[in-house]
């Protein structure tokens, strides 16, 4: 089968936004208009095609990024619908990594909400060109122009409207296209029929004002256009469109369109904008990587002729075909049944079938080309972020970084059968989601699961019950405390065991010192003159790392330290790797106790939006939770309070906030950094762990 759509006519886009700005509804409408769905699914009916997990349909939120493909005006658009809830940031992160462009959906009433900022920063990090779509223009309090100025103020972006609305709230009738200077007025409910008319008289001045701003932005992208514009010549429609495309792809500005997806208004012009202004795989820079053996920089061009390279960005357990690996092809061609080389793991794997996904129904295809997004069956060893490539031209593409979990709960299976199933089920879920981790607590023998927030873990437990039929009891959420040291010390570890036959001998001197937050663990070898043979150096590091897992004061993992081994001694006969591992562990324990140890806790960035009359109460409550207020701002009738609060003080906050504000307050929080726990609280934590 030859390529259906040329690379220039392929668009890989994501739909990203705050919860409830209408991402999934917008995607549903796109699928309806491009002929992929014959009946529109509504999120609030639990029937949206993209929200295919049971948990999503019940909660009306999108958890996993469903990938689907649609066609519009001779172009193929691969769409990834991403979740807006902060606990699922990992899904947004991995989607943005493999996209070429994104549609950022904003609610015309709420404008730029906290999660929009997080997602926006993630898109900035990957340099993803964007179109802003201001949705819900039919809602009470809709204000397109306020939305535009919020994008400029709160996101520091340069928004340029290429449309303006005709009316707002229940008077929202259509849109004015500032490129053609025509009005598009909707005449039926499905938004499939619309009349193109002249601009209503009362909006002519406003349309001219915004067209002038658009022309200015377009002229800025190109010197010839700038000269033409400054000399007062009229720019042609084609020149304007080319200028918008150039400005968007070059990240100079963000074109802004508007509509009401629920009322089917503005979705086709949004699709036109995606096709006209979003980059094709050939418009974005070549994908960078390194050669797995030499470590030298390498790259691949978006072309079918280059050697095959792809990035696996999501692993999913599927009830019918087993493990599905979603991947984005950057270069080359791949046929089903062929072998690929997983350069991250150093393994050859066979691709069984290649599927093109439409939310949760799938179509088998014989091969994929550069620029495609598809799912493969049969990749047993591949996990998120792995590179798949041609083994004759190996490359490791830049992967993604995922944050460490900040919250954990203990779970116990209800029966013996559940016990066996639970291990396999958790391993499958951990494969799908890199921010979900699990381990067994050494002391209690309990299984501990860790994640990015309460909702994240709730959904994991829910999936255990539904998909894997594992019934389990869940403990109270616990904070992922860590320990660290505050000053550098030198210490000795000596392990000598002399019993009949061969003895054990390991001896080392180490220096441990604190590092900056987020540095992890560094192990440095400064042994000279062979006082400790080379083969015993690594075991010392392993011994230190193992001791770090068991903490200093309260048994929490130790982070952000550098350990340097600088002296020691060995015995020709009695020394062994095991003896030096124990010596390393002993040296760390002896030193850490004298290094002014401290317990540190995750601190969350919190934003609370409340009506003005509850401000005092909310600020007082935040202070009582050891919070630090960073700032406040007014938006319409509400106030936003921003601050940092330790995670341990935030459990149950949703209920408290609801009762304090009569259900009118909302909040979001995301992990920000670790901070030292105050002495009185640290003592309580140590005592509790000792008592446990």
Swiss-Prot record:
Domain tr-type G span(s) in chain numbering: 8-282
Subcellular location: Cytoplasm
Positions annotated to bind GTP: 17-24, 81-85, 135-138
Gene Ontology biological process: ribosome disassembly
GO MF entries: GTP binding; GTPase activity; translation elongation factor activity
Residue span of region Disordered: 285-304
Keywords carried by this UniProt record: Cytoplasm, Elongation factor, GTP-binding, Nucleotide-binding, Protein biosynthesis
Top-rank lineage group of the source organism: Bacteria
Biased composition (Basic and acidic residues): 290-304
Chief location of this protein within or outside the cell: cytoplasm
GO cellular component, one term: cytoplasm
Family: Belongs to the TRAFAC class translation factor GTPase superfamily. Classic translation factor GTPase family. EF-G/EF-2 subfamily.
NCBIfam families cross-referenced by the UniProt entry: EF-G, PRK12740.1-3, PRK12740.1-5, small_GTP
Stated role: Catalyzes the GTP-dependent ribosomal translocation step during translation elongation. During this step, the ribosome changes from the pre-translocational (PRE) to the post-translocational (POST) state as the newly formed A-site-bound peptidyl-tRNA and P-site-bound deacylated tRNA move to the P and E sites, respectively. Catalyzes the coordinated movement of the two tRNA molecules, the mRNA and conformational changes in the ribosome.
HAMAP family hit by this protein: EF_G_EF_2_B
Official protein name in the record: Elongation factor G
Originating organism: Desulfitobacterium hafniense (strain DSM 10664 / DCB-2)
UniProt gene name: fusA
């Amino acid at each position: 089968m030859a390529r259906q759509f040329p690379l220039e006519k392929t668009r890989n886009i994501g739909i990203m936004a705050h919860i409830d700005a209408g991402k999934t509804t917008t995607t549903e409408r796109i699928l309806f208009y491009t002929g992929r769905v014959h009946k529109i699914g509504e999120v609030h009916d639990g029937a949206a095609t993209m929200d295919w997990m049971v948990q999503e349909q019940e909660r009306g939120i999108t958890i996993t990024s469903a990938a689907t493909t649609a066609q519009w005006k001779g172009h193929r658009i691969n769409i990834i619908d991403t979740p807006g809830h902060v606990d699922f940031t990992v899904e947004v992160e991995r989607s943005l990594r493999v996209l070429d462009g994104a549609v950022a959906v904003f609610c015309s009433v709420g404008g730029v909400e906290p999660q929009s900022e997080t997602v926006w920063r993630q898109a900035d990090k990957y340099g993803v060109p964007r179109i802003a779509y201001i949705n819900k223009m039919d809602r009470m309090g809709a204000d397109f122009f306020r939305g535009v100025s919020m994008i400029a103020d709160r996101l520091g972006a340069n928004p340029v409207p290429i449309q303006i609305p005709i009316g707002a709230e229940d008077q929202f009738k259509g849109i004015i296209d500032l490129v053609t200077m025509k009005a598009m007025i909707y005449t039926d409910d499905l938004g499939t029929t619309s009349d193109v008319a002249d601009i209503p008289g009362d909006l002519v001045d406003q349309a001219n004002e915004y067209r002038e701003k658009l022309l200015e932005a377009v002229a800025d992208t190109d010197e010839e256009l700038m000269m033409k514009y400054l000399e007062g010549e009229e720019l042609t429609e084609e020149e304007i469109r080319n200028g918008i495309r150039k400005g968007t792809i070059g990240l100079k500005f963000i074109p802004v369109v508007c509509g009401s997806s629920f009322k089917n208004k503005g979705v086709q012009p949004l699709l036109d904008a995606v096709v006209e202004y979003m980059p094709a795989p050939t418009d974005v820079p070549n994908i960078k990587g390194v050669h797995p053996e030499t470590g030298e920089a390498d790259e691949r061009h978006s072309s079918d002729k280059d050697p095959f390279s792809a990035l696996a960005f999501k692993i999913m357990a599927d009830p019918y075909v087993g493990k599905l690996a979603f991947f984005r092809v950057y270069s080359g061609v791949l046929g089903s049944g062929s072998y690929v080389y997983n350069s991250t793991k150093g393994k050859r794997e066979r691709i069984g079938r290649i599927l093109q996904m439409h939310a949760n129904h799938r179509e088998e295809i014989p091969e994929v080309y550069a620029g495609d997004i598809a799912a493969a069956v049969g990749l047993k060893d591949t996990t998120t972020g792995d590179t798949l490539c041609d083994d004759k031209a190996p490359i490791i593409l830049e992967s993604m970084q995922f944050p460490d979990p900040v919250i954990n709960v203990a779970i116990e299976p209800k029966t013996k059968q559940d016990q066996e199933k639970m291990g396999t089920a958790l391993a499958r879920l951990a494969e799908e989601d890199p921010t979900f981790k699990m381990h067994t607590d050494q002391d209690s023998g309990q299984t501990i699961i860790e994640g990015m927030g309460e909702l994240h873990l709730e959904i994991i437990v829910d999936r255990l019950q539904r998909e894997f039929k594992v019934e389990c009891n869940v403990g109270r959420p616990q904070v992922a405390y860590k320990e660290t040291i505050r000053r550098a010390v030198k210490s000795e570890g000596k392990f000598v065991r002399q019993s009949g036959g061969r003895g054990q001998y390991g001896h080392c001197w180490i220096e441990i010192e604190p590092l900056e937050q987020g540095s992890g663990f560094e192990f440095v070898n400064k042994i000279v003159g062979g006082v400790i043979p080379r083969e015993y150096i690594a075991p010392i590091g392993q011994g230190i790392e193992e001791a770090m897992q068991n903490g200093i004061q309260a048994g929490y993992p130790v982070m952000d330290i550098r350990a340097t081994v600088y002296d020691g001694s060995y015995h020709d006969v009695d020394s062994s790797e095991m003896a030096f591992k124990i010596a390393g562990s002993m040296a760390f324990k002896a030193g850490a106790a004298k290094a002014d140890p401290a317990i540190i806790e995750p601190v969350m960035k919190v934003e609370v939006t409340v009506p003005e009359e509850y401000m005092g109460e909310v600020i007082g409550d935040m202070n009582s939770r050891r919070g630090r207020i960073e700032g406040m701002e007014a938006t319409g009738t509400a106030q936003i309070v921003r601050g940092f609060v330790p995670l341990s003080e935030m459990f149950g906050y949703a209920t408290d906030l609801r009762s304090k504000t009569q259900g009118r307050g909302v909040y979001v929080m995301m992990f920000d950094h670790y901070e030292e726990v105050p002495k009185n609280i640290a003592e309580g934590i140590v005592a509790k762990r000792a008592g446990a």
